[in-house]
Amino acid sequence: MPDPAVVEALHDAVAKLHLGRQRRHVFLCVGGGKCAPEAQSEESWAYLKRRLKELGLQDVDGGVLRTKANCLRICVNGPIAVVYPDGVWYRKCTPKNLERILQSHLVDGVPVADLVIADDPLTAA
């Protein structure tokens, strides 16, 4: 039987992130310095966090979760990002391009075609 304090902490973390109510999850490659200079990746991460909050996309109604990934295994023309469940992979995720992705894809539901490197939506098994 799990420790009740651990169960409560997990429940609180799940509630805080609104898990189960998220519509999209953005993973951004940050770190390692292979696909982009580490400082550029960190700048993009800070921008993504700030803009998701400003746009109200990370709250329960916004429905977007974000995760910093160490490596998404496409080590060229980064930072690389992927938006699930859409399965849309993006290259060159600078703050300027992230703003385009935020407005077009996450707000309006239209991927930014000139930045897309792959499109592989998740499907139910």
Where are these regions (language model features)?
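Iron-sulfur (Fe-S) cluster-binding segments and ferredoxin-like electron-carrier domains
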Residues: 34-53, 77-97, 102-104
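Solvent-exposed alpha-helices and their adjacent loops that cap or buttress functional pockets
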Residues: 18-20, 58-59, 82
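Small-residue-enriched alpha-helical segments and adjacent helix-cap loops
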Residues: 2-7, 23-68
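Short, intrinsically disordered low-complexity segments
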Residues: 60-78, 84-86
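C-terminal binding/interaction regions
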Residues: 89-125
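N-terminal leader/targeting and pre-domain segments
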Residues: 1-19
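Short glycine/proline-enriched loop/turn "hinge" motifs that connect secondary-structure elements
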Residues: 17-21, 72-74
